[in-house]
Amino acid sequence: MIDFYYAPTPNGWKVAIMLEELELEYTTHLMRLGDGDQFKSAFMAISPNAKMPAIIDHDPPKSYGTNSVSVFESGAIMLYLADKFKRFIPTDPLGRKEAMEWMFWQVGNQGPMAGQLSHFVNYAPKDQQDYGHKRYGGEYERN
């Protein structure tokens, strides 16, 4: 069984899709970011950077020992699950390398650029949106 700490964000959606595609049993814990749920000590013990998403796997691979395992960051969670269930990740070295390149590109480039663009579109004062659109829109479209 997996506890899934989730907020309806692109990073949360990625992990939710992975859990569904693996047809796993999991319990969703909705984190109310506006209420500061991510800063509560119980959650910080799971995700020390106070970011979504995170999981606790109560039945980890034997190589992890007998205790439950927590994993935070969407890419780390997806890789952990892919490795555990031997699905959605190539096992040959070249295929795995290529999958890692695309995963790291998404979590380190495309995802953050989309997040910054969304921030400027949704929250920047109208007179400051042009810079955000030019900077992050251009990077996002380039990706």
Q: Where is each model-derived feature located?
A:
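Amphipathic alpha-helical packing segments from all-alpha helical-bundle domains
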Residues: 132-143
